[in-house]
Amino acid sequence: RIAANVSIVQDALKRTIAIENPSHYLTLEGHEFGEIAFLSELVRRSGCTLLVDVNNVYVSARNLGFDAEAIVDAFPADAIAEIHLAGHSADPVLGDALLVDTHDAPIAPAVWALYQRLVARIGPRPTLIERDGNLPAFEELRSERDTAHAVMHACLMAGAGRITEAA
């Protein structure tokens, strides 16, 4: 049903849309598919692309206790159209036991490492840095942009994304 709705939207817009992986704060029981299997099937059925939010992967992994690298490695490379990076914060009550995708902090080193891992596998993709609150000086924003550019450039020079995934 979701794939049909995505197709309806794409047909109405006469363009492909990208679906973003969400951040998770609790385990949802009874699902037929894991997130990557679900998103891969959505891509297959609807022809949509994926917007991979690396901070959402990290936040979800920390909150639910799974391996963020395994998730980053499992996204179908050919379907990824865009990447998002952002900062997160600890929950004001639960602290580091619950991370929240707040877009109000610098990008964490662990998120940068996941971004580098993803880009090394799939090659450079358009990347957006989200910063919605606690805006720093422009120089800090530019520094994050420069870091993302440097990661993409280094991966491109190393031949990232040239290995195709098995069908």
Residue ranges, per PLM feature:
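Active-site acidic/histidine proton-transfer and metal-coordination neighborhood
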Residues: 1-49
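Conserved, mostly hydrophobic/aromatic
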Residues: 17, 53, 83, 127
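Surface-exposed cleft-lining segments at the edges of enzyme active sites
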Residues: 21-31, 56-59, 97-104
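Active-site beta-loop-alpha junctions enriched in small/polar residues
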Residues: 22-24, 55-59, 85-90, 132-134
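Distinct, well-ordered alpha-helical segments
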Residues: 28-44, 60-73, 139-142
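Gly/Pro-rich active-site loop or hairpin
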Residues: 61-122
